[in-house]
Regions:
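ABC transporter nucleotide-binding domain
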Residues: 113-203
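ABC-family P-loop ATPase nucleotide-binding domains
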Residues: 27-83
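Helix N-cap at the start of a conserved alpha-helix in ABC-type nucleotide-binding domains
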Residues: 107-109
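Catalytic Walker B motif of ABC-type/P-loop ATPase nucleotide-binding domains
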Residues: 96-100
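Conserved ABC transporter NBD signature motif
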Residues: 4-19
Length: 247
């Protein structure tokens, strides 16, 4: 059973039109009237958001080559997504809540949308909250990450902090050094194929590498840790049974 209340900047959202004028929900399946055109939906959102940016709207539909007089139901999935991203940005809200916002966009349009959001964030105070299963799309875009499972927030932190405190290291040892490494390092994940070891370790990078060098590895280097790997490491840390999801 759901409980509690939702606050935005300390104010309740429920039955509060003034607060809602600062929120735009960008759904993975945007709602539009059956025979609506982009022009129709623009007029609809202009009534909801007095601060709607008409000039910005006209500029963006030209940039994305969208016909504002064509019925939205004739648009492709990607075109629909582009249309509602434009409406979201031009509504000039303080917060945009995005659900699978890059789904259905080809790589080029996806990059254009990211650049558009970045530009908008530089021009005004605006926060994007994104829900996504495609973590790769968020890797070079988001400042913070939160992991939600069954209604609970399992983990949240700044991505920059995660990548500075967690390191993926690959080494080659002449003999098995797993016991030593586990004793002296905070190992989150460990894998070994022959003498080739791949591990994810938490802690200060310099101290970790110094400890590894005590065993004189034949070869050792750190490699970039993806946001997906950070996700998996954190989920394993809370005993999340990923097999139930995959299988």
């Amino acid at each position: 059973e759901d409980a509690g209340e939702i606050l935005v900047d300390g104010d309740a959202v429920f039955d509060n039109p003034q607060v809602k004028q600062n929120l735009f929900y960008l759904s993975d399946a945007p709602y539009y009237f059956s025979n609506a055109t982009l022009q129709t939906m623009k007029e609809f959102y202009q009534n909801l958001y007095p601060q709607f940016d008409q000039d910005g709207f006209e500029m963006l539909i030209r940039q994305f080559n969208l016909n504002e007089n064509k019925r939205i139901r004739t648009f492709s999935k990607g075109m629909k997504r582009q249309a509602f991203i434009i409406l979201a940005i031009c509504s000039n809200t303080k917060y945009i809540l995005c659900d699978e916002v890059f789904d259905g966009l080809d790589p080029i349009v996806s990059k254009v949308v990211k650049d558009l959001f970045r530009q908008e964030r530089k021009m005004r105070k605006m926060t994007l909250v994104m829900a996504s299963h495609d973590l790769k799309e968020l890797e070079d875009f988001c400042d913070s990450i939160g992991i939600i499972h069954k209604g609970d927030l399992l983990h949240s932190s700044e991505i920059r902090k995660e990548t500075s405190d967690m390191h993926k290291i690959q080494c080659v040892f002449e003999q098995d050094e797993e016991a030593f490494l586990r004793e002296h390092l905070h190992i989150v994940r460990y894998g070994r194929t022959g003498n080739f070891v791949t591990m994810v370790v938490k802690g200060e990078k310099e101290a970790i590498m110094q400890k590894i060098q005590e065993k004189t590895p034949v070869w050792c280097e750190t490699i970039p840790l993806s946001i997906e790997e950070i996700f998996l490491c954190n989920m394993e840390g809370v005993d999340y049974d990923i097999s139930k999801v995959i299988f």
